Amino acid sequence: MLRVSAVFILLLPLFFTPVSTYGGTLSIVSQSRWVEVGRVLDGDTFVGNMGEHIRLLGINTPEIAHEASPAQPMGDEATQALTKLIAGKSVRLDFDKQRKDDYGRTLAQLYLRDGTWVNGEMVRLGMAHVYTFTPNLRWAAPLTLLEAGARQRQTGIWSTERFSMLDADDVASGNLGQFRVVQGRVGEIARDGFSFRMGHLKVSIPRKYRRYFGHSRVAHKGDRVVIHGVVRASSSGLYIALHSPSDVEKIAP
């Protein structure tokens, strides 16, 4: 069981209360617009009534069934949760640096007219995990806090074997291609500070993302950290690449 820091205790009420309080502080109204929800496709995507495909930015939900691929655990429940939140309603779209993804979908944070922050609420409910990518980092910090609360409560996806936190020593070839949350202690660190070991698992920051991490080391030897990323393999073994500062969290010893 992870030890809970004093900061986490102070923020605990946020994890049990619908996240409406973030609406006014994180949005830039001049860059916002309203759309009517037409059809919810899955837990993180919907179609507006004018045919626009909109992807909830900064989060990812389990996959629903697609042709030969079965649904992931909680995939249908995540779709139902988003449907309950936004179906038949007007939602405000707030934007970060990039407004479109490679599939042409609009990337946005969603807010209801009552101020509810939909992306944050999906994370708080345990129906989504944080999935940030540079340069879209404006909402990364509060999303990460909400995910930590959901993990601590083991609610939603965090109650399933597929999404539960792994210890670094337990990451195996069976996890290849999976987005996982992994905890462990930092071991050997590369001289440049952009890669380190957690047991047999290598953690690295690809060159093109390093400028987003600043000049200080991401972690120090002996630190206990939680990392987020896709498990991959190279000639030197299993590794996870970090793409944004929110992909690594320091936790109490």
What spans do the regions from the language model cover?
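Small beta-barrel nucleic-acid-binding modules, primarily SNase/OB-fold domains
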Residues: 2-253
